[in-house]
Amino acid sequence: MILIFGGTTEGRMAVDVCEEAGKPFYYSTKSALQQVELCHGVRLSGVMTSDDILNFCHQNDIHCIVDAAHPFAENLHKTIAETGIKVIRLQRQFGDKIDGITYCKDYEDAIQKMLQSGVLNLLALSGANTINKLKSFWQNHHTVFRILNREESVECAKKNGFPIDNLIFYPDSMPDVEEEKRMMSVVGCDAIITKESGETGGFEAKVKAAMALGLKVFVVEHPQLPADWIYVSGSHTLRRAIQHLVPDFFPLKTGLTTGACATAATKAALLSLLCDEYPEEVSFALPDGEVLTIPVECSSPGTATVEKDYSDDPDVLKGCRITSTVMPNKTGDIRFLHGDGVGTVTLPGLGIPVGDPAVNPTPRQMITNEIRALSKVGYDVRISVENGSELALRTFNYKVGVVDGISIIGTSGIVSPLSNEAFVESIGRELQVAKAIGCTAIGFASGKKGENALKEAEPDLRVIHYGNFVGEALKKAHNLGFQRVVLGIMIGKAIKLADGHMDTHSHKVELDLSKWGVTMARQLWDVMPPSFFTEIEKNCWKHCRTVFPDGELEVRLIRDANV
């Protein structure tokens, strides 16, 4: 069983990830104030003592703790460490240190540094729980505290004898830089103190506003946590960590794209050149900014290999070895050269020049970002795949004009399982969660691009990925009584659906584009008239109506982008 400690934005993220498993887990918060959507999770509210936590873990067979609590919940972090249970820390990003800020290791250190700096009028943005910690300062120096406008925060101030007239409250929404500047000007402070709370909590706006006004800024650094915990920074890395510690929790395992593997291999190869290091693992950023750390093999300067890990997706490339060789060039540019086992592009439409190695645009950008973070000179990057030419014969690369090898692909860096019964069941579980939290409308998209397009039009629409299982997703939505469905679909899948195929996988339905004179479905947007797409939408709607007979149904064609 898994126990999550939350009450934060990260806590919500952990809940969303664990709900995907469709199995019970516990979610504990200090109070019941946080509204969180639970279907399979069990909510625990209230302060737990050390003994309470230890007893609960023992009685409920807790094998993994996800610590998604606030960075400054020091007593809780200490108790979690004492359980002896494996811990995953869902850690927010803190960013680099900022010049001009005085960093403090704790509140005692902050008080000493504020006294030395001659602070006379302090604005404390560190929360009600720090009123007591800063007491020796505010008893002798004018201080205004901004706190949450709730009873327990005000009571905390009263309990510590803080002047109620010197309290101000956060607005309903997180203030931006200009709003923070106006507030600070009204308060008339000459310094602020806040916590190193990371990218959430408005830290950046507070600091930018104060520095723009010429105020002194004191930041209390976040406490250090045990080195033997597993640290993750987002939903993908959290799921991978849970898969590692509790292998049977998720019915399906996610994996890495070839693009993610090539990026990690390239970074390791470059590090071996620049630093004479041979790392056993490297960290790199996924397209959404989440940082992932994976094992690498690096035994000679400029060359490194990553073995593509195993997911539950029926992927012919599982376990293949992807190698990157990096050498400096004199052009100042990053160039992608041909490597064994990686195909050559022979037709337009992929967003890659004809004749280039089939390293798709998103992996190219990921690789470029990692190189540029380390060096500004030019490099030649040669990606190769062991047995890639043979593996390519088991793919559909030839249909898009990629010959003599595989493509290095991936828009998210993560492979989500798409093609078995368990994935269809996971669609049902996500729909059950949506229904349980009161959703009457649902969006369906094949993947992340479609989800982004639907959410751009309707930010509050809950979107579920159907992969290729359009019919199954719509049936389940109908059976659960959803009143409205918005189906986002890209043109290639839409043509199959318009022809009556409710499973759009290329293994099930082949798409013959030659009759339109194109080689890639996305090229249809450039050669066909608007009436063509209107007709496609109408036919898609007609077939979807057979499995979603009641309620409002919308079909939206989504214009594809380069993968």
Which residue ranges define each predicted feature?
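Short, polar loop motifs at secondary-structure junctions
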Residues: 27-35, 90-95, 128-131, 148-152, ...
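Glycine-rich, highly charged phosphate/nucleotide-binding loops
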Residues: 40-60, 169-179
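Glycine/small-residue-rich loop that forms an oxyanion/phosphate-binding "nest" at active or ligand-binding sites
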Residues: 54-110
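Anionic-ligand binding region
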Residues: 127-167, 177
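A C-terminal functional module that forms or caps the active site or interfaces directly
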Residues: 158-165, 170-187, 191-213, 218-222
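Generic N-terminal targeting/processing segments that precede catalytic cores or assembly contacts
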Residues: 249-398
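A structural signal for small-residue-enriched, beta-sheet-centric alpha/beta enzyme cores
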Residues: 253-256, 400, 406, 411-534, ...
